């Protein structure tokens, strides 16, 4: 029984780990904000409980934004926290023409993220 629980937990961890497979570097995020006229950036931390809860539905929604969605792990990256004015994770920010136009901070419902993407697309 115990081995079965470990196997299930390991499988869930691997599925969540795969969500972050396409994450961006800080340089890629900086360049995308500067060069693209419209981009969403999801700031998260690997050890953030709230990020672990929302990532399974937030990331697939963001990936439907046709290349206008980037994922950045800011755990331990104080410069990114300050540069992008991140107060907490998860944080989803939309940039248009190099400037932040809106953000949603903290753990939110699937519907709230969906509405955010729809209103900012």
Where are these regions (language model features)?
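Non-catalytic, surface beta->alpha helical segment in thiol-disulfide oxidoreductase systems
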Residues: 93-121
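The canonical Cys-X-X-Cys-His
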Residues: 48-51, 92
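Structural micro-motif
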Residues: 84-93
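Short active-site neighborhood of thiol/selenol oxidoreductases, capturing the structured segment around
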Residues: 34-46
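N-terminal targeting signals for export/organelle localization
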Residues: 1-19
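Typically the conserved alpha-helix immediately C-terminal to a functionally engaged Cys/Sec
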Residues: 50-65
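A short beta-strand-turn-helix
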Residues: 20-37
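Thiol-based oxidoreductase modules, predominantly thioredoxin-like and allied folds used
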Residues: 43, 62, 66-79, 88
